Design a protein with these regions (language model features):
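Conserved S-adenosyl-L-methionine
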Residues: 150-256, 261-263, 267-270, 275-279, ...
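Non-catalytic alpha-helical coupling and interface elements of nucleotide-dependent molecular machines
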Residues: 2-6, 121, 140-144, 197, ...
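Non-catalytic, mostly N-terminal accessory regions of nucleic-acid modification and defense proteins
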Residues: 1-163, 167-168, 230-239, 339-343, ...
Length: 468
């Protein structure tokens, strides 16, 4: 907020600094700021001032709680109320985890503020959102992991997020709206702001998240990335049993990294749900992967593209999942299957894949890309570097077969493979074994046999001499 206000005011007065104003003076601009940004923070409550006063503030926890309460209170009765309501519900400044006594908690909070203040993030408005955004999202993933959740459910690496966004955009320079039914921290949605610029996502960002803590973190993430409250629509709830964006569909771009093979309430009544009835079968109770896939297909516009990170088991598992794959293949909506390298995601080392869906395919072919070797090792993790992402993206766009890397298969060929969509069924693996020269091998064997014969004759000769 400080940067936003200073940027405007310094056009008139280059020395203006919102952080140095009195709360009474700043109050005059409160109504306008709430209308523009969705909330109001007086100068005394800004992070820089809270940090400066922290060492001498014996009731820092009370001060911080009051700041959070006042920010939320400032939005009451305004259009931004729903996007600010409960935003800080999970921030427990009086938690015993911070210390057993009031004094210990205040000391720990002071150290936390000082640690954040000391981070070399720079002015993220000048350097771009990546540094600040990545740091925030990584911290969220760490929080989720320590809370006993899979980091992959909360944090999709930036390089994977970018690839998904660019696949759905397919060189478009603008888009209507984007949707993620399992939005986690919002990192996938925010990639569209990075790739296109926020002004080129005309109707905004739509998402749903079942975990309350992560839902709040996602909304904070939107505000921190300077997405206006009027442009993001993040809902809390179970996407499969209680979808919140029915009235907002269809979407031109859908991206998601749903939880892998999670349990869900596959009530038999859902068979008649518009999202699932085409397959005439529901995804297994212990593996909701393809339920999310069918949900996204239902919400996709006729000219749109969905790019979904999937657990590879959905490509080959049998029974209900095989029937759902059969439905997807016969409906001719599977545009591409991309096998990714293993160990890409935070909190898991499994190899994943990307399933790309389209309703307006030009023919009945599906492109299979084996990108399992497209990575660079960095520390303990594998990374999709810019060259890897570009190779995958261009291969997807050009749709030309490349030996040992990608192949096209029509519906008939996929049917011959019993609707198995595993990439290695269609992309021939390169034989990396050393070629054997049979002629040279036979010559070598002959030489060995001759040598053995000579040695045997010599041994027999020695024995005869000894016997004599």
């Amino acid at each position: 907020m400080t940067d936003y206000i200073n940027k405007k005011e310094r056009k008139r007065d280059p020395s203006f600094d919102y952080a140095k104003l009195s709360d009474e003076v700043a109050e005059r601009a409160k109504e306008g700021l709430i209308e523009e940004k969705g909330f109001f923070i007086p100068p005394s409550a800004l992070f820089c001032n809270a940090l400066k006063n922290a060492p001498s503030n014996e009731d820092l926890n009370v001060t911080l709680q009051n700041i959070f309460n006042e920010i939320e209170k400032s939005s009451l009765g305004t259009p931004s109320e729903e996007n600010v309501k409960g935003l800080f519900a999970d921030l427990e400044v009086n938690s015993n985890k911070l210390g057993s006594s009031h004094k210990n908690r205040v000391e720990k909070l002071t150290k936390i503020l000082q640690a954040i203040g000391g981070m070399q993030l720079g002015d993220y408005l000048k350097s771009g959102i990546d540094v600040f955004g990545d740091a925030y999202e990584y911290l969220m993933a760490m929080y989720a992991s320590n809370a006993g959740k899979s980091g992959g459910e909360f944090f999709t690496p930036q390089e994977v997020s970018e690839l998904l966004a660019k696949i759905t955009l397919h060189n478009q320079e603008s888009i209507n709206k984007v949707y993620d039914p399992c939005c986690g921290s919002g990192s996938l949605l925010l990639q569209f702001s990075k790739v296109l610029g926020d002004k080129n996502v005309s109707k905004g960002y739509f998402g749903q998240e079942t975990n309350l803590t992560t839902y709040n973190l996602c909304r904070i993430n939107m505000f921190l990335h300077d997405i206006n409250y009027s442009k993001f629509h993040i809902a809390h709830g179970d996407t499969l049993s209680d979808p919140k964006h029915e009235d907002d569909k269809p979407f031109d771009a859908i991206v998601s990294n749903p939880p892998y093979s999670t349990k869900w309430d596959s009530n038999s009544l859902l068979k008649d749900d518009e999202r699932f009835k085409k397959a005439n079968v529901l995804a297994p109770k212990n593996a909701a992967d393809l339920a999310f896939t069918m949900h996204m297909l239902s919400y996709l516009s006729n000219s749109g593209t969905a790019a979904i990170v999937e657990f590879p088991g959905v490509l080959y598992r049998g029974n209900a999942e095989a029937k759902i794959r059969e439905c997807l293949v016969k409906e001719n909506v599977i545009d591409c299957v991309i096998a990714l390298p293993n160990n890409l995601f935070f909190g898991t080392s499994i190899a994943t894949c990307i399933l790309v869906l389209k309703k307006n395919k030009k023919d009945d072919t599906t492109l299979f890309i084996d990108a399992s070797k497209e990575f660079v090792k960095e520390g303990k993790k594998n990374k999709l570097k810019a060259c890897n992402r570009e190779k995958i993206l261009q291969t997807y766009i050009e749709r030309k077969e490349v030996k040992h890397f990608c192949a096209l298969a029509n519906i008939e060929k996929i049917q011959e493979n019993d609707y198995n969509l595993s990439v290695n069924r269609y992309v021939e693996q390169e034989d990396t074994k050393e070629a054997i020269d049979i002629k040279a091998l036979n010559s070598e064997i002959s030489q060995i046999v001759e040598k053995q014969s000579a040695l045997r004759n010599r041994l027999e000769s020695i024995i005869k001499e000894l016997e004599a």
